[in-house]
C-alpha cells in the first residue's frame, strides 16, 4: 500500500514544484500542473503538465547517464498514489545557487541583453544577430536564482566564480555545455531545435556535482521545430513560449509592465499548450505519453 502525501512533511514549494521530506537522505519532488510566465504563477493550470515534465526528465536522465539525483523508479513504492506519474524520489543535495543556462540560439532575455550590450552575460557576440540567430558556438549564460515573484538575474561567469569558486564554476560551465551539446544533437536527429536550456546542480556529501531538478523539459528549455526554421522571426515552439506570446499579445489585454497579475488562460490556449507539451515528449522520446505512469 502506498503512503499518502500527508505522511510526508512539506519542505518547500516553488512556482511549479513542491518538495517533501521522505527521510534524511531522500526527498519527494512533485511537479504540479501550474505554469509560470514572466515571474507570475498563472491562475489556470495545464492538465497533465506535471506528468509531462516528469516523464521528460526521466527520459533525459536516462539518455544522459552519469550522476543525477534520481533515487527510485517512476513507480517507486514511496510515491503516493495521488501524485504517481508527476513525482520522483530524489537524493537530498546541497543545491548550487546558480541557474546554469546554455544557449545555442539568440532569443528571450539573451536577445534583450545582446541588443543592449552586444553580449550575453558578458560573452561578446558577433554583430548583426537577430531573433533566433544560431550562435557561432553554444554559450554559458548563468543566472542568479530569484525568490518567488522576483526576476532571475543574468550574471557573468566571473560572478559565478565569486559565488562558488573557480573550480566549481568551471565544472558548472563545462557540464552545462556538455549536456546542451549532447541533448541538442539528440533533438536535432528528431527534427527539433533545442534553442536553450536551464539546468540546476547540487553537491552530494562527497562534494560530487550532481545534475538535479528537472532536465530538458518544455518548462526549462526552448524547443522549436527544425522544419521551417528561419532566423529573424519568432519561432513556433513546443514549450511555454506559446503562453508567453498569448499573454503579451493583444488578445490577453494584459500589460506586462503593470502590477496586475496575468488573466486566466482561455480554454483553447490551455488545450493547445497541453498538446504542445505532449508532442514535445512524444517526438523527442519516441514514446507514447499514454503509456506513462499515472
Swiss-Prot record:
Question: Is Transmembrane given among the entry's keywords?
Answer: no
Q: Might you give the EC number(s) for this enzyme?
A: 6.3.2.6
Q: In which pathway does it act?
A: Purine metabolism; IMP biosynthesis via de novo pathway; 5-amino-1-(5-phospho-D-ribosyl)imidazole-4-carboxamide from 5-amino-1-(5-phospho-D-ribosyl)imidazole-4-carboxylate: step 1/2
Its UniProt entry gives the catalysed reaction(s) as: 5-amino-1-(5-phospho-D-ribosyl)imidazole-4-carboxylate + L-aspartate + ATP = (2S)-2-[5-amino-1-(5-phospho-beta-D-ribosyl)imidazole-4-carboxamido]succinate + ADP + phosphate + 2 H(+)
PROSITE patterns registered for this protein in UniProt: SAICAR_SYNTHETASE_1 (PS01057), SAICAR_SYNTHETASE_2 (PS01058)
Query: Which enzyme type, at the first EC level?
Result: ligase
- Keywords tagged on the record: ATP-binding, Ligase, Nucleotide-binding, Purine biosynthesis
User: Which terms under GO biological process does the entry name?
Assistant: 'de novo' IMP biosynthetic process
GO cellular component entries? cytoplasm
GO molecular function annotation: ATP binding; phosphoribosylaminoimidazolesuccinocarboxamide synthase activity
* Xref: Pfam families: SAICAR_synt
Q: Which residues form a coiled coil?
A: none
> Matching SUPFAM superfamilies, A to Z?
SAICAR synthase-like
Q: Which InterPro entries match?
A: SAICAR_synt/ADE2_N (IPR028923), SAICAR_synth (IPR001636), SAICAR_synthetase_CS (IPR018236)
Which domain of life does the UniProt lineage start with? Bacteria
Q: Which family does it belong to?
A: Belongs to the SAICAR synthetase family.
What NCBIfam families does the annotation carry?
Answer: PRK13961.1 (NF010568), purC (TIGR00081)
This one is known as Phosphoribosylaminoimidazole-succinocarboxamide synthase
Q: Which organism is it from?
A: Rhodococcus opacus (strain B4)
